[in-house]
Curated annotation (Swiss-Prot):
Keywords assigned by UniProt, alphabetized: Cell cycle, Cell division, Cell inner membrane, Cell membrane, Cell shape, Cell wall biogenesis/degradation, Glycosyltransferase, Membrane, Peptidoglycan synthesis, Transferase
Gene: murG
List of residues binding UDP-N-acetyl-alpha-D-glucosamine: 15-17, 127, 163, 191, 244, 263-268, 288
Pathway recorded for this protein: Cell wall biogenesis; peptidoglycan biosynthesis
The protein's name: UDP-N-acetylglucosamine--N-acetylmuramyl-(pentapeptide) pyrophosphoryl-undecaprenol N-acetylglucosamine transferase
Catalytic reaction annotation: di-trans,octa-cis-undecaprenyl diphospho-N-acetyl-alpha-D-muramoyl-L-alanyl-D-glutamyl-meso-2,6-diaminopimeloyl-D-alanyl-D-alanine + UDP-N-acetyl-alpha-D-glucosamine = di-trans,octa-cis-undecaprenyl diphospho-[N-acetyl-alpha-D-glucosaminyl-(1->4)]-N-acetyl-alpha-D-muramoyl-L-alanyl-D-glutamyl-meso-2,6-diaminopimeloyl-D-alanyl-D-alanine + UDP + H(+)
Function: Cell wall formation. Catalyzes the transfer of a GlcNAc subunit on undecaprenyl-pyrophosphoryl-MurNAc-pentapeptide (lipid intermediate I) to form undecaprenyl-pyrophosphoryl-MurNAc-(pentapeptide)GlcNAc (lipid intermediate II).
Source organism: Klebsiella pneumoniae (strain 342)
Length: 356
C-alpha cells in the first residue's frame, strides 16, 4: 500500500486534551501522503478547530451521560445506536484503512462502527487512568497505546503527542542556566481557569513578595477579578491574562509552573522541561492525580491535592525551590518526557494499516 492510498479517520472530540494530540498525528501522517478525515460532534471545539487545520470533518450526534437525568439514561441505547448508524454510514463512504480513537464520546459509536465494518481500530489513551469509552473499545481494538503507565496493563507507553513549538524549546540546561532575579512562576488553570488558583495565588504572591514574579492565566472572564485580587494583596505588578495564545513562549519564560494536571498539560510541561506544582482537579477517578504522579516520582514535580492547596503550603513549596533545585527538576522533567510521541503513534497506525 503506498502512502497515497492510505486513509485514516481520527475519532476525537470534546476537549483540547483529545483534539490536539489527534491533530498532531493527523498532520504527521498527512505529510506522508495519507488522506485524513475526522469524526466529531458539531457542538464541541473540534467543529471549528479541525477545519481550521485543513482537515475535513464529519459529525455524529452523541453526548455524555454523566450528570444527566434518568430519562436521558433510559434513552441512551437509542442515542448510541443512532450515532453508530451515522458513523457507519460515514465510514462506508470514506472507507478508511484504519481508525484512530483519541478519546471523547464520539470514539464509542465510531469505534463500534469501524469494528462492525472490519476496519481496524487503534486507541490512544491520554490519561493515567483509562476512560470508560476506551475501556470498552480496548476489547475490540487491534492496538492500544497509553501516554502514562498504568491506564492499561499491557499497552505500550508512547506518551502524548504535543505541539511542535513546545518540542522546539531549548533544553533546560540552555534555557535556565544563568538566570537570576525573582523566580518566574507561570500559573495556568486551563482555558476555563481554575478557581482555586485564582483565589490562592494572589495571597501566595503577598507572602513571597519580591522573591517571585508571576504570569497568571485566569481563564475566561476572570482577568479583572484576579487582577483586583493581586492589587488587594499589595501585588499589582504581576501579569494577569485571560488566555495565553503562545504557550511555548510562556513555557520559555517560566522557571516553574503551577497548574492543574490534565494529560496534555502534564505532557507539555515534561516536553518543555519545566518543574511543576500540580493541583489535580478533584474527579472521582482521580484522573489528574494519576497523570501527574510519574513526574512527581521522577523528582520533577510536587502534587498538592486541592484540600492541601493552601496559601501556606504553596508559598512554602515555592520558597523551598532555589534555582539549582529548579534546574535539576527541569532536567528530570525533560528526561521523563517522550518527545517522539507523535511519531510513535503514527508508526503504530501505519503498522496496523499495513497488516490488513
Amino acid at each position: 500500500m503506498s502512502g497515497q492510498e492510505k486513509r485514516l479517520m481520527v475519532m476525537a472530540g470534546g476537549t483540547g486534551g483529545h483534539v490536539f494530540p489527534g491533530l498532531a498525528v493527523a498532520h504527521h501522517l498527512m505529510d506522508q501522503g495519507w488522506q485524513v478525515r475526522w469524526l466529531g460532534t458539531a457542538d464541541r471545539m473540534e467543529a471549528d478547530l479541525v477545519p481550521k487545520n485543513g482537515i475535513e470533518i464529519d459529525f455524529i450526534r452523541i453526548s455524555g451521560l454523566r450528570g444527566k437525568g434518568i430519562k436521558a439514561q433510559l434513552l441512551a441505547p437509542v442515542r448510541i445506536f443512532n450515532a453508530w448508524r451515522q458513523a457507519r454510514a460515514i465510514m462506508k463512504r470514506f472507507q478508511p484503512d484504519v481508525v484512530l480513537g483519541m478519546g471523547g464520546y464520539v470514539s464509542g459509536p465510531g469505534g463500534l462502527a469501524a469494528w462492525s465494518l472490519g476496519i481496524p481500530v487503534v486507541l490512544h489513551e491520554q490519561n493515567g487512568i483509562a476512560g470508560l469509552t476506551n475501556k470498552w473499545l480496548a476489547k475490540i481494538a487491534k492496538k492500544v497505546m497509553q501516554a502514562f503507565p498504568g491506564a492499561f496493563p499491557h499497552a505500550d507507553v508512547v506518551g502524548n503527542p504535543v505541539r511542535t513549538d513546545v518540542l522546539a524549546l531549548p533544553l533546560p540546561g540552555q534555557r535556565l542556566v544563568g538566570r537570576h532575579g525573582p523566580i518566574r512562576v507561570l500559573v495556568v488553570g486551563g482555558s476555563q481557569g481554575a478557581r482555586v488558583l485564582n483565589q490562592t495565588m494572589p495571597q501566595v504572591a503577598a507572602k513571597l513578595g519580591d522573591a517571585v514574579t508571576i504570569w497568571h492565566q485566569s481563564g475566561k472572564g476572570g482577568q479583572q477579578t484576579v487582577q483586583q485580587a493581586y492589587a488587594a494583596a499589595g501585588q499589582p505588578q504581576h501579569k494577569v491574562t485571560e488566555f495565553i495564545d503562545d504557550m511555548a513562549a510562556a513555557y520559555a519564560w517560566a522557571d516553574v509552573v503551577v497548574c492543574r494536571s490534565g494529560a496534555l498539560t502534564v505532557s507539555e510541561i515534561a516536553a518543555a522541561g519545566l518543574p511543576a506544582l500540580f493541583v489535580p482537579f478533584q474527579h472521582k477517578d482521580r484522573q489528574q492525580y494519576w497523570n501527574a504522579l510519574p513526574l512527581e516520582k521522577a523528582g520533577a514535580a510536587k502534587i498538592l491535592e486541592q484540600p492541601e492547596f493552601t496559601v501556606e503550603a504553596v508559598a512554602s513549596t515555592l520558597a523551598s525551590w532555589d534555582r539549582e533545585t529548579l534546574l535539576d527538576m527541569a532536567e528530570r522533567a525533560r528526561g521523563a518526557s517522550i518527545p517522539d510521541a507523535t511519531e510513535r503513534v503514527a508508526e503504530e497506525v501505519s503498522a496496523v494499516a499495513l497488516a490488513r
